[in-house]
Amino acid sequence: MSTTSSFQSNADGTRITTYTWAETPGQPVGVVQISHGLAEHGERYDRFARALNAAGFIVHAVDHRGHGRTAGDNLGDFGSAGFSGLIADVAQFGALLRAQHGPQLPLFLFGHSMGSFAAQAAIIDHSSTWSGVILSGSTALDLFAAAMANAPADAPAGLAAFNAGFEHRTGYEWLSRDAAEVDAYVADPWCGWDVPPDVIPSLFAPAPRLADPAQLARIRSDLPILIASGDADPLAAGGVLLEQLGQRYRDAGVADVAVKLYPAARHEILNETNRDEVTGDVAAWLRAHTGLA
């Protein structure tokens, strides 16, 4: 079970709902901060968080601005600070967690999809906050944005565009091969809502900075980065965009960058048919980067 709290965003005063899973066997070995994706919410990570608890990690998540309990009846409204405020919230929450848990416990940032874009931005300015970063369902945002801009005029808009290459039972088959997981997403009132037309462009706005070698060079060279996705994820372009993203970090001087692709897996690798494999791999990577085997 998670416990719920909140903090006030320094960006514009928005109250950000937080969740904590802290039932570790024995003393914790580390802390994981989760930054979720667009049109979902923090409590969807309950199964993953409990698995990380079993591996010795305390887990914290949020409902980002415009999402879940943070948004209430205003889903999709990112507030006056917009997506830049969401990025600032990720950094602020990381600093709060670092202060709460102290220097003795390593703090890792796990960002999925939109949350991974925020993580990519946050580590440019605040890489000293975290002991390692995992980017799930991510992409080289500038290249992906360019591909989206070149889509045919009659192509589906919003999240529906990502389902073009998949069967169309619900319109969200691009998320997972597991029909039960897709159905749970569709049934969740805090998931899959209509994305306001200004949101997608706002997510793409940081793209030039995320591709700028001078900006990436600000990331500390000893920050471990794991990029993990399904190779059938539309954002991955068969893995090509993830390899390019990983190479950018290497070229910027980051020494420990790994790219892990799961064959045939789709966007939400934590909710895929091979989710136990993915969760085990993530837990093993985390433990390895705490100095534990």
Feature-to-residue mapping (PLM):
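Conserved loop-alpha-helix segment in the C-terminal half of the alpha/beta-hydrolase fold
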Residues: 231-261
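Conserved alpha/beta-hydrolase
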Residues: 44, 49-75
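Alpha/beta-hydrolase fold nucleophile elbow
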Residues: 101-113
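Alpha/beta-hydrolase active-site loop
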Residues: 79-99
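Alpha/beta-hydrolase-fold enzymes
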Residues: 110, 116-195
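Short beta-strand/loop motif that positions the catalytic acidic residue
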Residues: 227-229
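N-terminal cap/lid segment of alpha/beta-hydrolase-fold proteins
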Residues: 1-25
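Catalytic active-site module of serine/aspartate enzymes centered on a nucleophile-bearing elbow/loop
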Residues: 252, 256-293
